[in-house]
Amino acid sequence: MIFDPTFRRLGLGASLAVAAALVAPAHAEITIGAIYSITGPAAALGTGPRNAMALWPKEIGGEPVRIIVMDDASDPSQATRHARKLVEENKVDVIIGSTVTPGALAISEVAIETGTPQLAASPVELAPEKEGWTFRLPQSIALMAEGTIEHMHRQGVKTLGFLGYSDAYGESWLRELKKNADRVGITMVAAERFGRADTSVTAQVLRLLATRPDAVLIVASGSGSAMPQLTVKERGYTGKIYQTFSAVAPELIRLAGKQAEGTYGLSGPAVAPDQLPTDHPSRQPALEYIAQYEAANGKGSYNQFAANIQGGLLVLQEAIPVALKSAAPGTPEFRRALRDALRTVGEVAVPQGVLDYTATNPYGFDHRARFVLQVQDGVWRAVD
């Protein structure tokens, strides 16, 4: 693996891997580029994926793999520059990233322009004419918003307040929430926004709580989900609080403490695989991956953002051998063959659900990729 030296020093293992690759030239080396938010406001989302890449095998489909990991510093303009460098200079066969929606959106422009498959590590939404080269590793916002509203409806929620990011991720959630809320008779009584780098949401929370909603949905991610959670609780709110799948992780509980108790969130199977039915297709892949990841990074280090990247590995292990039958890596023909293979390999059980990409479904997941959790006694637990 190569971590771009501009951003990350090579570890000894990585250095040896690179040296070995130089001594023994590859017959058909596959180059995988990854762009994550390892620093900046969204760094909590990029650390797990970076660590996940370090566990990837040195070969896929019998061919050597070169991995280049770059840090976009939570900046979409950096993501664009890195994507162009990966395609034009490094001749990558696929780009993974970014871990935040604005960055993934920026990379998607390069992907479609250059005909390079992208495995987005955030649930970026694209206009129909921009689809074609971008596949998503997390669940779609549409899938998770639908499940969230359905749970609220079962809980008797009639009015909902929205408190979320003022970017593409937040707006996508707001749009899907409104659509699903209208369907079941839940009224959106407030929609307040804040920036990812904001340090206070007091004014927004005061306006939101003045509408007395039955439930509040916080649309934030990683460590950024704790500050609005604390503000809502500190202002005396006693209704139901929901977080999105980008916040359902130990990080929220660590930062919000007891103020996280009772919070609901929909997430993928990888968050609590031991609580899945024994016949769930993701139970075993997730349990095995947690053991592998924590053996390398320490107990309690695992999160669903790393699991998304493991899903990328598993689907590439199915698609790359198919693409190799018709083209050589490092060529436009191989990139197209890989794109086509991703669309046709069929169901692949991954830690977050069952991926089944098609030409018309670049999200891949179905209802098996979501379940409801609640913070109980400092732990995310599955609930009805």
Predicted regions and their residues:
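Extracytosolic ligand-binding ectodomains
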Residues: I2-P5, G13-A14, A28-D384
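Bacterial N-terminal signal peptides
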Residues: G11-A21
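Sec/Tat signal peptide C-region and signal peptidase I cleavage site
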Residues: L22-A28
